[in-house]
Amino acid sequence: MGGKNSRETTPDTSYQRSNSVTYAARHQHAPAPQRRLDRRYSRIGDNYETLEQVTSALAQAGLESSNLIVGIDFTKSNEWTGMRSYNGRSLHSVGALQNPYEQAISIIGQTLAAFDEDNLIPCFGFGDASTHDHGVFSFYPDSRPCQGFEDVLSRYREIVPQLKLSGPTSFAPIIEMAMTIVEESGGQYHVLLIIADGQVTRSVDTGSGQLSSQERNTIEAIVKASNHPLSIILVGVGDGPWDLMKEFDDNIPARTFDNFQFVNFTDIMSKNVDPLRKQTEFAVNALMEIPSQYQATLQLGILGARRGYSPATVPLPPPSNDILRSPSVHQYHVN
């Protein structure tokens, strides 16, 4: 996803929200002994066929509201991974019509809006020249969340012209950012939506049967995230390839519960069927594991609990934030 020769040295610091509460140094503890999970949650299947079935299952699971976090991939490969699926244009090209990233955000937003009662959505970018594979940047200079998906889309359009696509690609920083937010919320249930254009970076120097540092860090982050009430949905846009994403979905060992769902946005949206039907199929595929994942966090006793060993992550400001408009500061608090 990112450039082959990208290098970066973004330092790790602590996460600070706009109300000046510092998400900084925290004591590191060994993970608490884990309860034995019902086998049906160790590998959660794709269970539903209609959006109504998913919505009903969410309600039956007791999920009345969730907190959303959005992560957007700004690696350089977005310039060419739309060669087949997006008529050769950059997947981040901004014009009169929505690009694949905007389409995915809009459809998920329409579906999950009813479950995000405070309408505050922390949004982050990764893989650009400021973050590479070591960090994330917030959509707002003071790290406050976006106010609904319309604000997400608006800020996305303002940010895209100001940044430089780069790499390499790792999902570890955005997953660690999400774990920090979950921990500081007191263990509230969150859904992390990552929209990305392909694989985690795998160098030509990585031998057969070995993992690149980006692959290893991503897998470790997914495993650690399963100790938190956090579901991860990775939406793939562009041409792929997607084989490693499917491995992440099905075959990562040692997780407390199956916390990761991969959805091939391009495959669904390229079908020759009614647009509304495609949008529904995409939403169903993205959300179908959420009811069982939420039930797993209840059974494991990790919902509503601080784990005490999440990363302490701070986002950078958005690229060229002096150019971006900055409305009056909106404080948001963890309840």
Question: Can you describe what each PLM-predicted range is?
Answer:
Residues 1-335:
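Acidic, low-complexity intrinsically disordered regions
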